[in-house]
């Protein structure tokens, strides 16, 4: 499959089955995703693999962040969650927004690679990504922020056909205005 075919056929999978890529399979895709554009090669990102009981720890942290008791079931919707973290690096050349863009680029590239490898993926966020309890559950450092999670699992049978309306490039692509 070509890169353009992979991008044009991707979709978000809000429901996935209980199978997930192994750590080794994921690591290979992370290696490839790490090739995104990265000004000054700062690598201002890291990924945290959440499986099994890790998801319950996150569920309790989300519930606490929402002022609820018990555990949120949201992290149990997929057998594997990959937390996407921007790890800001000191740099006079690379502003924080650009470092966050690199981390987001890694996440998006990883989601494309997972989809192309046959896995269902959806990127989930929420206000609790900025909550201190959720940050602590992930072991985030002072220079880090959570951007969200890739929920990863098997693609349910019979759900492959999902057509998005074709994008009109003229709505989003223009030329710079001519000097007058």
Report each predicted region and the residues it spans.
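Short beta-strand segments
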Residues: 84-85, 151
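Short, electropositive alpha-helical surface patch
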Residues: 134-147
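Short, charged/polar surface micro-motifs in flexible loops or helix N-caps
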Residues: 52-57, 88-90, 132, 156
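N-terminal amphipathic, basic helical "cap/leader" segment at the start of enzyme domains
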Residues: 1-80, 179-180
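C-terminal helix-cap and adjacent tail motif
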Residues: 5-12, 17, 146-180
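Generic beta-strand structural signal
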Residues: 80, 117, 146-148
């Amino acid at each position: 499959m070509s890169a353009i075919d992979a991008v044009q056929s991707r979709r978000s999978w809000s429901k996935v089955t209980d199978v997930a890529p192994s750590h080794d399979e994921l690591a290979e895709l992370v290696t490839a995703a790490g090739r995104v554009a990265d000004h000054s090669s700062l690598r201002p990102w890291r990924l945290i693999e959440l499986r099994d009981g890790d998801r319950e720890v996150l569920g309790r942290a989300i519930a606490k962040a929402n002022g609820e008791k018990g555990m949120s079931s949201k992290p149990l919707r997929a057998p594997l969650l990959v937390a996407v973290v921007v790890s800001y690096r000191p740099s006079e050349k690379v502003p924080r927004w650009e470092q966050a863009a690199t981390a987001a680029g890694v996440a998006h590239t990883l989601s494309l690679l997972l989809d192309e490898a046959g896995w269902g993926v959806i990127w989930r966020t929420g206000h609790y990504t900025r909550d201190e309890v959720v940050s602590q559950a992930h072991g985030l450092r002072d220079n880090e922020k959570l951007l969200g999670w890739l929920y990863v699992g098997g693609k349910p049978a019979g759900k492959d056909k999902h057509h998005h309306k074709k994008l009109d490039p003229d709505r989003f692509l223009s030329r710079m205005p001519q000097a007058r």
